[in-house]
Structures are given as structure tokens and as C-alpha cells.
């Protein structure tokens, strides 16, 4: 069955049929196609555009098709051009001529615009739910590690001491912003294109407010040409997914570094690691590496759709069919990565002693030594130079700042006194950082309370 062909005098070339067909991938939103058709048929009946008895017959027929697909009784086959053709043909086969009235006042242009919007709307919600679960794991790790010291890095060099709670809090903030972007996308996209027709609406007295309400939208879209050609919501969602994947990729890179023999900050669970076919000793962070690798795949979907849309005149063009495969793949890839990442960090173990020892080395307390001098009246720029001399002395002797004698301190600056050792201890360096957003346990607990409230309210 074709939904068109009356003005054609030749059969379509088989290669053209195969090239044009989309059922191999758009069958993914069979449920949304049925939901949209049920709403449309219900509205047609209430408006008196078709008899209510036939509207009810169509609705029941569509519900039966949905039940049979989901039970496995009915298989979607690729002999049809697209999911819309399959649905209409199956409906007519089951209920007869009444099924031929379903497409009254509707085009495949607004039908597919609706289906994709319904499908994407649910994917936005699904992704948001996955992110929230990941954030719950991050928050649990934060609560358990407010006093677990580790080095903080800049330029991948040790900089200042922080805690695991503080480090993981940075990712909590990233994913919080990601969720905010998803919520914004939902607000903008949640308007119904059904009733836009091919591009110029229809002469039938459709009740677009009713169909929008039945489908859970805030209301109908306001321009029929934009309605059938808008893919902004998809571009926005793919952009948000790309940002999520970028955050996961950064996190994955750190997991790979921390898991290396040179760092040994963490131990990944066996269930989330793999081995080598030749090297018996290997325990590889493949999940983190694959998440990092799949980031480019999601980026590619975004760039592909932007490129597809950049030269398309109003309104609908067949180019837009290319939005589906790449979007479906990106949706599944991002959700899968979030879910696996959650399991990986939920089961990994921290090597607290190793991290603390690493935090004590590398002069992470040098800034605190400079601050010590500032509090005793030395201008910061002078203090910076003094501590730089001390660091050079330590490097030459292969010792830490803590290992210098008081005489060695005083030889560089007489301002130093016995209390320098307490001032540059790891505990003090972290505990004294009490500005909001810093790693000090006291302020960290306040931030955790804020995050708890966020998780309850969002």
C-alpha cells in the first residue's frame, strides 16, 4: 500500500523505493504514531468531521494494533514505506472503510513532526531520570568522603589539596546544569504540531487545543510552516547530550588516570573492568574508555543534523528524514553511557592512603605557606617569591616543605616561626578553606545539604 500515487503513470523504481523508505528506523516510534492517531481520531469525532461511531472504531482498532505489536503478535514489516503507511494499512485491514477516514485533515508532514516530538520529549525525560540516578551516586560518594584527601590538579600537575567530596562535587554541578538544560528544552518543545497539515493548515474545523491537551502538550504550535519544518528541539537536545557526553568524557579521563598503576587512586570493580587476551595481569578501564570514545559519536549526530538543516528552505523537505537514525543512535548512546558510568563509579573503591600520600607530595601546601606569611604582614607578591625559594630548596634536597627545619625557613625569611608546620599540614590546608564552594569539610557539609534539597525538589 502507498499513501500516494494517483497522479503517477509508472511504478516507482525499486531502488527509489528502498532509498526513500524509512520504516527500518521510524518503526521505533510506532507507539507515538498510534498515540497521535488516537488523539486525532478522537478530535475528528468530537468535531463531527467524521461520525463518532467511526472515530470510536478507529480508536479501538489502533489500541488493538498497539497491544498486538507489544505482545509480539503483530510484526512491523519493511514492505511499507514508513511506519505511518504500515499503521494505516493495518488499520484498514482490521476495521475496513472506517480506517480510511483516519488521515482526514492530516498530512504525513505534521504526523511525523508530532511523532518525533513525542518520542524526543520522552527521551528528554528518560535522560533526565538517568542523570538524576547518576547524581545520587555522586552525592552518596561525596557524603562518605568529606575527609578523604586527594591532590587537586591544574595542567595535570599537583596544585592544592582537596577532598574526594569536593572533586566529585564539581561533576555534580556539571550534571545539575545538564539537567537544567534538559528542563529548558522540554519547556520549549512541548507544543503540538498536529493540525499544521502539509504546511498551510487545513480547511477542516480541527480542534488543535483538544489534540494538544490529549497528548500532554501545553498547547498547539502557532505557525504551520514552522511546525512541519522545525527541528530546533532536536538540535537543542543533541547539543545537550553532547555537553553531557563531554562531562562524562572528562570524568572518564580522570577515571583512567586514577586507575593507572602510576596513580592507583581507585580500584574498579571486576564487573566493570575487562582483561587482556595476552597479558594476564591486565585489568582495563574499558567502560571509561568507551564512554570517552562514544562522545565523538554523539557530537557527530549534532553536527550532522546542523549540516542537514542549514540549507533547507521552508517548509518540509525530504532531507529531514535524515534526523531520525542519527538521533535515535545518539539518544541510546548517551543513556547507555550514563547508566554504565553510574554502575562503574558506584562500585569502585578509593585508595585513601595512596591519595592522601599523593596530596602531601608535590608542594600542594605551597600556597598555604605563602598565605601564612601574608597573615603575618608580608605582601602576597613577596610571600610568593619567598615560598618559591623554599620550593627550589626542597627540590634540590628531594624533600617536602614539611621536612624543612625551622632554621632553614628562617634563613629565607625571619617571619617564619614554629607555627608554620601546623599552617601547612594537610588537615589545616583543607579545613581552613571555608569560603562557599571550597573543600573544607564544614562548608562541604553545607553544600551537601543544598544538594540533598535539590535532589528532593528536582
Curated annotation (Swiss-Prot):
This is Argininosuccinate lyase. One of its GO terms (molecular function) is argininosuccinate lyase activity. PROSITE patterns: FUMARATE_LYASES. It comes from the Bacteria. Its EC number is 4.3.2.1. It is found in: Cytoplasm. Pfam families: ASL_C2, Lyase_1. The gene is argH. The keyword Oxidoreductase does not apply. One of its GO terms (cellular component) is cytosol. Belongs to the lyase 1 family. Argininosuccinate lyase subfamily. Keywords: Amino-acid biosynthesis, Arginine biosynthesis, Cytoplasm, Lyase. One of its GO terms (biological process) is L-arginine biosynthetic process. Pathway: Amino-acid biosynthesis; L-arginine biosynthesis; L-arginine from L-ornithine and carbamoyl phosphate: step 3/3. It catalyses: 2-(N(omega)-L-arginino)succinate = fumarate + L-arginine. It comes from Lachnospira eligens (strain ATCC 27750 / DSM 3376 / VPI C15-48 / C15-B4) (Eubacterium eligens). NCBIfam families: argH.
Amino acid at each position: 500500500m502507498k499513501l500516494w500515487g494517483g497522479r503517477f503513470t509508472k511504478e516507482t523504481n525499486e531502488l527509489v523505493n528502498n532509498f526513500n523508505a524509512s520504516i527500518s528506523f521510524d518503526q521505533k516510534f510506532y507507539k507515538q504514531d498510534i498515540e497521535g492517531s488516537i488523539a486525532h481520531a478522537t478530535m475528528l469525532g468530537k468535531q463531527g468531521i467524521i461520525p463518532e461511531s467511526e472515530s470510536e472504531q478507529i480508536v479501538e482498532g489502533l489500541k488493538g494494533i498497539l497491544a498486538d505489536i507489544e505482545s509480539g503478535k503483530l510484526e512491523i514489516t519493511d514492505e511499507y514505506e514508513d511506519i505511518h503507511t504500515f499503521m494505516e494499512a493495518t488499520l484498514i485491514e482490521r476495521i475496513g472503510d472506517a480506517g480510511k477516514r483516519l488521515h482526514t485533515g492530516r498530512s504525513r508532514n505534521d504526523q511525523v513532526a508530532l511523532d518525533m516530538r513525542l518520542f524526543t520529549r520522552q527521551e528528554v525525560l528518560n535522560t533526565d531520570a538517568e542523570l538524576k540516578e547518576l547524581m545520587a551516586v555522586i552525592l552518596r560518594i561525596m557524603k562518605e568522603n568529606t575527609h578523604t584527601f586527594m591532590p587537586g590538579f591544574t595542567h595535570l600537575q599537583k596544585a592544592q589539596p582537596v577532598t574526594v567530596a569536593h572533586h566529585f562535587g564539581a561533576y555534580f554541578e556539571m550534571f545539575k546544569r545538564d539537567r537544567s538544560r534538559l528542563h529548558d528544552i522540554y519547556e520549549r518543545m512541548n507544543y503540538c504540531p498536529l493540525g499544521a497539515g502539509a504546511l498551510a493548515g487545513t480547511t477542516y474545523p480541527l480542534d488543535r487545543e483538544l489534540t494538544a491537551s490529549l497528548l500532554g502538550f501545553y498547547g498547539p504550535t502557532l505557525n504551520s510552516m514552522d511546525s512541519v519544518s522545525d527541528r530546533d528541539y532536536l538540535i537543542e537536545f543533541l547539543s545537550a547530550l553532547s555537553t553531557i557526553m563531554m562531562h562524562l568524557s572528562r570524568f572518564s579521563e580522570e577515571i583512567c588516570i586514577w586507575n593507572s598503576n602510576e596513580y592507583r587512586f581507585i580500584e574498579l570493580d571486576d564487573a566493570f573492568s575487562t582483561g587482556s587476551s595476552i597479558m594476564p595481569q591486565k585489568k582495563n578501564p574499558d567502560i571509561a574508555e568507551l564512554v570517552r570514545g562514544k562522545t565523538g559519536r554523539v557530537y557527530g549526530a549534532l553536527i550532522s543534523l546542523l549540516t542537514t538543516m542549514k540549507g533547507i528552505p521552508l517548509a518540509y523537505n525530504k532531507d529531514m528524514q535524515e534526523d531520525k537514525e542519527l538521533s535515535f543512535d545518539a539518544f541510546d548512546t548517551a543513556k547507555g553511557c550514563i547508566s554504565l558510568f553510574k554502575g562503574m563509579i558506584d562500585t569502585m573503591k578509593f585508595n585513601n592512603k595512596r591519595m592522601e600520600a599523593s596530596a602531601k607530595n608535590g608542594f600542594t601546601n605551597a600556597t598555604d605557606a605563602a598565605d601564612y606569611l601574608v597573615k603575618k604582614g608580608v605582601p602576597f607578591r613577596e610571600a610568593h617569591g619567598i615560598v618559591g625559594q623554599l620550593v627550589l630548596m626542597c627540590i634540590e634536597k628531594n624533600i617536602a616543605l614539611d621536612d624543612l627545619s625551622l632554621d632553614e625557613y628562617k634563613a629565607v625569611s625571619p617571619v617564619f616561626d614554629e607555627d608554620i608546620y601546623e599552617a601547612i599540614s594537610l588537615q589545616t590546608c583543607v579545613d581552613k578553606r571555608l569560603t562557599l564552594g571550597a573543600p573544607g569539610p564544614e562548608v562541604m557539609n553545607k553544600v551537601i545539604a543544598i544538594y540533598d534539597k535539590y535532589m528532593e525538589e528536582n
